[in-house]
Amino acid sequence: MVANWVLALTRQFDPFMFMMVMGVGISSNILYSFPYPARWLRICSYIMFAIACLIFIAVQALQILHLIVYIKEKSFREYFNDFFRNMKHNLFWGTYPMGLVTIINFLGALSKANTTKSPTNARNLMIFVYVLWWYDLAVCLVIAWGISFLIWHDYYPLEGIGNYPSYNIKMASENMKSVLLLDIIPLVVVASSCGTFTMSEIFFHAFNRNIQLITLVICALTWLHAIIFVFILIAIYFWSLYINKIPPMTQVFTLFLLLGPMGQGSFGVLLLTDNIKKYAGKYYPTDNITREQEILTIAVPWCFKILGMVSAMALLAMGYFFTVISVVSILSYYNKKEIENETGKVKRVYTFHKGFWGMTFPMGTMSLGNEELYVQYNQYVPLYAFRVLGTIYGGVCVCWSILCLLCTLHEYSKKMLHAARKSSLFSESGTEKTTVSPYNSIESVEESNSALDFTRLA
């Protein structure tokens, strides 16, 4: 029974599972630094962070187990083809580094909060955070560049061309979707992550000036590269919307993915430009210098700040647009019904499926972007509206993450128990003996997939 349950669970692994870490993790970050702070919210953030860590460890272990079993049953080449060349799976590897970044950001916040209380522990934690950040950056680059190359290299003819006259037309009709952004958004996320700690006091005590400068430069290069790449893909997706129209009901929540680079990009550029100003103020003092040097020392950092503010507001403006379009698209399916072929159940747009998770992280990034704009510039110009918007986006993100988490736990517990029972009965029948494998076409396993199918989003 236990073996059947484990094998059934192993078969359900998909890189998309790390989306749960993203949603719960960013919720913990939002609660920790909520626009209207409260002690009980800080306590809730610790709980959400613990849940995010547990999910990350569990999914990581499941991924390793899935890899071992898959290679044992088939081969590494088939694993590579299925999970790195097949666009139903490879795009979702981007959720892994983004989920890890939410954990890194929370650990960085804890390190900064304990700078005076426990300097030694805070310093050691910051070093650990910095090492994790470099690991995450490496993973982001491998995924963004590697998966993009595999997609561009050739078509992966898993299902053939179907009713299309060529692979080109099939690609244009089926795969020009917002999920293409999932492999590039991690670059935006990891670039903004280093901005949260690079110029902090504890980072200054743990590392020298050269490390800070190198980190700032790499952060800037990563952010610029990612934003350009993102807008190229968004332009392609706009073309798809004009040609193929909005996604079908089961995929409509993927529209929210467009909010991710907008909110996180604004958050990142605000932190980056503010860190440049802090760096100049710290290492280029205005004492004993000429008037021209003093003007440059003051003007150059503020030029970056102004560019950061304008860029952030432009990205947030697009984020508001995508928010409205996404909500209206969902509402347009309110009266539509679909019947599942496998179970015959009637599905509505509000029937829970894994696509619901696609709304959590993007809403959280919009909260971070709005709140950071308020924090940095409210001292010069009243910007309370952005604080309110950050609260609204953050509240939706946290509540939606909790809803998705509870519904996911319910679906998994129900379907896994069902799959294990059916597999056990099937293998013990007197007429047919079958070795229960994660890759055998057993009826019970197929039935369990109906509500847990991640590939419908790709």
Swiss-Prot record:
Q: Which Gene Ontology terms cover its molecular function? A: sulfite transmembrane transporter activity
**What InterPro entries does the entry give?**
SLAC1/Mae1/Ssu1/TehA, Sulfite_efflux_TDT, Voltage-dep_anion_channel_sf
What would changing A122S do, according to UniProt?
In strain: Bb32, M1-2A, M2-8, MMR2-5, MMW1-15h2, MMW1-2h2 and Sgu52F
Record PTM Phosphoserine, positions in chain: S444, S448, S450
Keywords of this protein's UniProt record, alphabetized? Cell membrane, Membrane, Phosphoprotein, Transmembrane, Transmembrane helix, Transport
**Carries keyword Isomerase?**
no
Question: Where in the cell does this protein reside?
Answer: Cell membrane
Question: How does this protein lie in the membrane?
Answer: Multi-pass membrane protein
Identify the residue ranges that face the Extracellular compartment according to the record. 33-48, 111-135, 198-220, 276-309, 372-387
Q: What is its main location?
A: membrane
A Gene Ontology biological process term: sulfite transmembrane transport
**Gene Ontology cellular component annotations, sorted alphabetically:** cell periphery; endoplasmic reticulum; plasma membrane
Instruction: Give the similarity note.
Output: Belongs to the tellurite-resistance/dicarboxylate transporter (TDT) family.
Explain the purpose of this protein: Involved in efflux of free sulfite. Mutations in the SSU1 gene cause sensitivity to sulfite.
Protein name in UniProt: Sulfite efflux pump SSU1
Q: Which gene encodes it?
A: SSU1
